[in-house]
Regions:
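A glycine- and small-aliphatic-rich helix-loop capping segment at beta-alpha/alpha-beta transitions
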Residues: 10-21, 42, 46-48, 67-70, ...
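Glycine-rich phosphate-binding loop plus the immediately following alpha-helix
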Residues: 37-40, 52, 67, 72-101, ...
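General beta-strand structural signal in soluble alpha/beta enzymes
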Residues: 49-55, 105-107, 125-126, 251
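Adenine-nucleotide phosphate-binding core of ATP-dependent small-molecule kinases
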Residues: 163-218
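Short beta-strand-loop/turn "lid" adjacent to the catalytic site in phosphate-handling enzymes
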Residues: 1-31, 60-65
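Glycine-rich phosphate-binding/hydrolytic loop that grips phosphoryl groups
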Residues: 230-231, 237, 250-286
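Glycine-rich phosphate-binding loops at beta-strand->alpha-helix junctions
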Residues: 220-239
Length: 286
């Protein structure tokens, strides 16, 4: 559910107020906004509750993490919160540890790439897909002065430039494909340029992990690499080799959103977690 203002992690009970926000004042136009609407409609018909869980707008970061470097612009926490937090909780259970006692860095590698640092159960800082590593179709962090020059060059319209950053940026801008498997096939066939771009992606992810490790003063219990691209041994090992000096690396591949939703709400139903009732007046900022 991408169109909500910043919210805390966990489950939210879907209600009329949430639907009104998503229909009339969404903060982000995204297909995931339909999930709450569809769920609420079905739940009302059969007389049960419906929930969202860890939407992309989860924001538990401290004020210091919002400072961007330009007064008019605050950093905005829009990350793959559902999968990254689910993998952090799953990692803790796998190792018989309490998630709330761990410091974890989770990197989600998919069509977009984002990272979070989890400090004792809270996602206190982040690297979004607009300010960090490039990905198969997103440009990530770009040189700001050169970007401004390109925007005002007359070469592109606003819509074209926005698409260049999200949709035509990243790997596809260099290699004309968004398919990581195809890139690896090209590397295996001796394509040196494909290797350069793919290795640059691995390096940028590793640098973002290193950046987030400073948030907890280097006290990191584990680094988790997840998302669809984490299935790639080449990519996972390339990143791991650069960051394993910080903390042990756990590869947990896949975009496990459906599992995360199911287990999140199951924890609510079992009394392990309590769902929050969505109210605009309670939000971090509305």
């Amino acid at each position: 559910c991408g169109g909500l203002p910043p919210v805390k992690s966990g489950a939210y009970l879907i209600n009329d107020e949430m639907i009104d926000r998503l229909v009339n004042r969404p903060t982000l136009d995204h297909a995931s906004n339909l999930g709450a609407m569809i769920s609420y409609s079905i739940a009302n018909e059969i007389g049960v509750n419906s929930y969202i869980y860890d939407p992309v707008s989860v924001d538990e970061s401290n004020k210091i993490a919002k400072v961007s470097g330009l007064k008019e612009l605050d950093r905005v926490c829009l990350t793959h919160a559902l999968n990254t937090r689910a993998m952090a909780i799953k990692y803790a259970k796998m190792h018989n540890k309490d998630y709330k006692n761990l410091n974890l860095i989770v990197a989600h590698l998919g069509g977009g790439i984002s990272l979070n640092v989890h400090e004792k159960g809270r996602m206190v800082d982040f690297v979004t897909d607009e300010e960090g590593p490039f990905s198969p179709e997103r440009a990530g962090k770009l040189p700001s002065k050169m970007l401004v020059d390109l925007c005002y060059s007359g070469k592109y319209t606003y819509e074209e430039m926005a698409k260049n950053i999200r949709g035509k940026g990243g790997i596809v801008s260099y290699l004309n494909t968004v398919n990581a498997k195809e890139v690896e096939e090209r590397i295996n066939n001796g394509d040196g340029y494909a290797k350069l771009i793919y290795d640059a992606l691995a390096l940028q992810v590793a640098k973002a992990i290193g950046e987030l490790s400073t948030v907890v003063n280097g006290n990191v219990d584990a680094i988790i690499i997840t998302g669809g691209i984490a299935y790639s041994k080449y990519m996972s090992e390339s990143i791991s080799n650069r960051v394993k000096f910080i903390a042990p690396v756990e590869i947990m591949p896949g975009e496990n959103e459906l599992e995360a939703l199911a287990f999140g709400v199951l924890r609510v139903m079992n009394g392990e977690e309590e769902a929050t009732v969505y109210r605009e007046t309670d939000l971090i900022k509305a």
